[in-house]
From Swiss-Prot:
It catalyses: cytidine(1402) in 16S rRNA + S-adenosyl-L-methionine = N(4)-methylcytidine(1402) in 16S rRNA + S-adenosyl-L-homocysteine + H(+). It is an enzyme of class 2 (transferase). It comes from Elusimicrobium minutum (strain Pei191). NCBIfam families: 16S rRNA (cytosine(1402)-N(4))-methyltransferase RsmH (TIGR00006). GO terms for biological process: rRNA base methylation. One of its GO terms (molecular function) is rRNA (cytosine-N4-)-methyltransferase activity. Belongs to the methyltransferase superfamily. RsmH family. This is Ribosomal RNA small subunit methyltransferase H. The lineage of its organism: Bacteria, Pseudomonadati, Elusimicrobiota, Elusimicrobia, Elusimicrobiales. It is found in: Cytoplasm.
């Protein structure tokens, strides 16, 4: 197994805002390589427990090795399974805290075989759960031009969505699009580079969201947070693009108006300059925290 690394973001802020009981039960809904979990366990007591969820089997195994702490229970499922898992583990009353870090792990981005980045020339895959049915190749080779335009516009906020979709449909007439580099080359003439940002970035984001139903998963889970948390328990959600942040902001706001939660931070929390300097991938992170009433 490769020795991948991933630097967790906003750790100090998470530690300060999520922990309400040092011997409580916490959920890391996006375990990844275990960076946030390892940091939190360093602050928690001996009786604390963290239940970590990740759809990526390799991530779960690497997290277990990286954390190496009996207080972690790592589960190879989506965080949507949290209500059932709490019940199965006979945890009464709910969790003291839930953390979601909705960013892509560095090891997933840097592993060309996963197909998340146009940099490595790997297969067009993009599945978090490699046992899942639909890949990014399935999307680009089977969706109509109208369907591609819709996901590029809605999930990637790509202003040239129609041109990008048309370029893909033209190219796949000759042969199936199979690799990330093939797709990036097809898009290059119609999606020029935006400063330091590759022109295909938003299309790749849109494909990843479509393949993994990311926005639907986030929305469904945030709505059931009151079932997962005990009174006084907190949910901390880190987002990396405006679509996710808008969903979290609006649902927290609605829950607050209905008296289910109170907002711990009324204004979004972003990384300090020093963190961004040391970890460039943290620059777009935004943290929102709510507490169950």
């Amino acid at each position: 197994m490769n020795n991948w690394t991933h630097i967790p973001v906003l750790t100090k802020e998470i530690g300060q805002m999520l922990i309400t009981d040092i011997n409580g039960v916490y959920i890391d809904g996006t375990l990844g390589l275990g960076g946030h979990t390892k940091y939190l366990l360093g602050l928690l007591g001996k009786e604390a427990k963290i239940i970590g969820f990740d759809k990526d089997y390799n991530a779960v195994k690497m997290a277990e090795a990286n954390v190496a702490d009996g207080r972690l229970t790592a589960i190879n499922l989506s965080y949507e399974a949290a209500p059932k898992v709490l019940k199965d583990l006979k945890i009464q009353g709910g969790a003291d805290g839930v953390l979601l870090d909705l960013g892509l792990s560095s090891y997933q981005l840097d592993d060309a075989s996963r197909g998340f980045s146009f940099m490595g020339g790997g297969p067009l895959d993009m599945r978090f759960d490699i046992s899942g049915q639909k890949t990014a190749a399935d999307v680009v080779n089977s969706y109509t031009a109208e369907e591609l335009e819709r996901i590029f516009a809605n999930y990637g906020e790509e202003t040239n969505a129609r041109n990008a979709a048309a370029a893909i449909v033209r190219a796949r007439v000759d042969k199936k699009i199979k690799t990330t580099s093939e797709l990036a080359n097809i898009l290059a003439p119609v999606l020029p580079r935006r400063g330091k940002t590759h022109g295909a970035t938003r299309v790749f984001q849109a494909l990843r969201i479509e393949v993994n139903d990311e926005l639907g998963t986030v929305e469904r889970f945030i709505k059931v947070l009151p079932e997962v948390l005990k009174p006084g328990g907190r949910a901390a959600v880190i987002t990396f693009h405006s679509l996710e942040d808008r969903i979290v902001k609006n649902i927290f706001k609605q829950m607050s108006a209905e008296g289910e939660v109170k907002l711990v931070n009324k204004h979004v929390i972003e990384p300090e300059w020093e963190e961004v300097k040391n970890n460039r991938r943290s620059r777009s992170a935004k943290l929102r925290v709510a507490e169950k009433i």
